[in-house]
C-alpha cells in the first residue's frame, strides 16, 4: 500500500486514477509486486489506508524509514545543510464574516453539519510573498548539500514565519555542522546560540532600512548563495511532481500530499 502512495505522489494522481493505473499498467504492477491475476486495492480501500496513516500520524515514521534506507545505500547527509521554505497553495475558502472572526481567534466554527465542515479547510491561512497573496500551507525543509536530499521537514499553515522552525530542522546526522539559509532567517541571538553549540551558521545578511550592504557583506552573500541555491533544485523537483498545490482539506492530510513528508521521502528516492 505504501508503494501506491509512491505512485500517487510521483505522478500526482487521484485515488481513482491510482486504482485505474495500477490495473492498466504492467510497469506499475511490477513495481507493486503484483501479477495480472492479483487483487488490487480499490480507490476506497486506498483512501481508508491514507486515512489510517493520517490518524496514526505515521507520515514521519515513513519518512524516517526512507532516511534509513538512504543511509544503508550510502546516501549519508554530508557537507552541511540548506534550510528554506516554500508555499503550498490550497483552494481558496469562502467564509462568512462571523466564521472569519472565529477562525482568527484560533477556534473552529460550530455551526453547520459535520459534512459541511468537512468541506471547509480550517487550517490553511493567507500570507504575502513579494507583494502577492497566497492561501494554503508552508513546507519548511532541510536538505543536505552533497546529495540535495530532504532530511527534515515541517509543514505549517502559510502564515507561519519561515524562521519559526529553523532549529527544528537542524539535522544532527549531517557530517558537517555548517548550515546555510537566505536573509529571511536573520536572527542574531539565535546565530550566537547555535554558534556556541558548535554550529557554523551562514545566513545571508539583509540591509537595514536606509542603508546598503558593505562590499564585504555583499561578497559574503554571494558565496552563501552559490551553496544555498542547491536547495532550490529540491523545490523545483517537487514542483514538477505537483508538490506546490494540494487538493485535500486540512493540515493533517497535507502531510500525505505534495511536499509533505511522504512526497519528500519519495522525491529523495527518485
Tell me what each language-model feature is.
Residues 1-12:
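Alpha-helical support elements that line or immediately flank enzyme active sites
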Residues 20-23, 33, 37, 41-196, ...:
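Polybasic low-complexity intrinsically disordered regions
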Residues 178, 183-256:
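Helix-centered, glycine/charged polyanion-binding patches within enzymatic domains
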Amino acid at each position: 500500500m505504501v508503494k501506491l502512495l509512491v505512485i500517487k505522489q510521483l505522478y500526482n494522481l487521484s485515488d481513482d486514477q491510482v486504482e485505474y493505473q495500477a490495473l492498466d499498467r504492467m510497469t506499475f504492477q511490477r513495481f507493486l509486486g503484483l501479477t495480472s491475476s492479483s487483487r488490487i486495492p480499490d480507490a476506497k480501500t486506498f483512501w481508508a489506508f491514507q486515512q489510517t496513516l493520517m490518524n496514526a500520524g505515521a507520515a514521519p515514521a515513513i519518512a524516517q524509514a526512507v532516511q534509513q534506507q538512504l543511509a544503508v545505500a550510502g546516501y549519508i547527509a554530508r557537507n552541511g545543510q540548506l534550510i528554506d521554505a516554500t508555499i503550498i497553495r490550497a483552494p481558496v475558502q469562502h467564509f462568512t464574516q462571523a466564521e472569519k472572526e472565529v477562525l482568527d481567534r484560533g477556534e473552529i466554527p460550530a455551526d453547520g453539519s459535520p459534512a459541511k465542515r468537512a468541506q471547509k479547510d480550517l487550517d490553511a491561512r493567507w500570507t504575502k510573498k513579494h507583494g502577492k497573496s497566497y492561501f494554503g500551507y508552508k513546507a519548511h525543509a532541510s536538505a543536505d548539500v552533497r546529495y540535495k536530499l530532504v532530511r527534515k521537514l515541517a509543514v505549517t499553515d502559510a502564515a507561519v514565519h519561515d524562521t519559526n522552525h529553523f532549529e527544528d530542522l537542524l539535522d544532527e546526522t549531517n557530517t558537517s555542522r555548517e548550515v546555510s539559509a537566505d536573509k529571511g532567517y536573520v536572527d542574531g541571538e539565535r546565530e550566537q546560540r547555535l554558534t556556541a553549540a558548535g554550529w557554523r551558521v551562514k545566513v545571508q545578511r539583509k540591509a537595514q532600512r536606509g542603508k546598503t550592504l558593505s562590499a564585504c557583506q555583499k561578497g559574503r552573500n554571494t558565496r552563501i548563495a552559490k551553496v544555498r541555491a542547491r536547495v532550490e533544485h529540491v523545490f523545483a523537483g517537487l514542483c514538477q511532481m505537483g508538490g506546490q498545490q494540494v487538493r485535500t482539506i486540512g493540515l493533517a492530510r497535507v502531510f500525505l500530499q505534495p511536499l509533505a513528508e511522504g512526497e519528500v521521502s519519495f522525491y529523495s528516492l527518485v
